[in-house]
Amino acid sequence: MILSLLFIATVFAAINAVPYPACAADTLQWTAVNIPVEGSTGGLWKLANGSDIRYLTMANDGTLYCYANPAGTTHTLFKSTDGGRSWTTPGKVTDVIIDIAALPQDGATIYYATASRVYKSEDGGNTFVTLPPSPGGAGSGNVSISSIDVVRVGDGNTVAVSTIDTDAAQFGGVYLLEDRPLMGTWVNTAIGNYDVYRVAFSPNYNVDRQIIAIASNEVDTFAISKIYNGCWGQNPANACIGGIMPSAANIAFPNSYNYLSGAASFFLGIDTGVNKGDVYTISSTIIPTAYTATDLHIGSAYGINAVDIAGLAISGSTILAGCADSAGVYLSNDGCISWTQCTRAPTGQSGTCILTVPDFNTQHKAYAVTRGQESAFSYSNDGGLTWNQVRTIDFLLVQ
């Protein structure tokens, strides 16, 4: 014990004998650092306080578009040409956007929809023209546009919009417009008594002339198809998901989708707003010619019976599903046999919209946008397992 005390005393004496360097206060100085500020710098956005980010869309040249509503500007359409690292506001659009569609055959042509109108740009969003207004009476009588899609057909484009009517026992529909130099008017495709939450052209529309709609009769949800000039639900017959009414829906087509093969499947993500949704496989059979819906129960491994879905993306055997009521992402790498939650989610609180890059199977890169506090544009380079925020971050730094 005495030897230990002597050793400690010797050590302290040695330490005290060593002269201290000059006081830090005498030699060091604090320097102000310019932290990022809200809004744009040189036209490029970094922080976007108060912003919700939605409808992330990729043109065929890789250009990204989205809707956002930051407090620092009235502009709402954002564009990135560098994978989301920087964003500009082309066209100075100030509308409340409800959907964005890029023409698959032309990277410079995009469309966006409001609740009652559709707008078109052929120069990457720098200028827009207005298409004929109010398809199906949208903008009056509680009727509003719910989604938009577009495809090149011949020497022009065909535009499809879906509408809903929030009045009880009143319904929306699907309307087509031939966007050509001699433009006509919106044509009612007569889908019947349904509110339609999503409309999409088949990836092979120029061959199979198939349009798919996700609709509700205010009780159940239906996947409905129309081929050429035939009637809706005629071939194949509708798939019904009983007891579920959507507030929004998403469709994702596999790379190999081919309706004419007679056994084509696509994926449906349903957001009910009350957490009763999920991801479904919609499959067509040859005999009888009908759709069937299979609930994939993506949360079952975690004891979760249903998951509302805000975004859906597919590449090869990998499927990514973004949650509607959180920023979470579920992924399957084996064609929907098993599902895993991401280990680090995109920042934000809800409304996770997802895109995969065209060469996802090589790069394993995907993008996501979210809503709520700390919503942001995020990316993943490991197939959706972990996510990192990049830009348009909903955060206010106070100096």
Regions found by a protein language model. Give the residues of each.
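Extracellular glycan-interacting surfaces
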Residues: 3-399
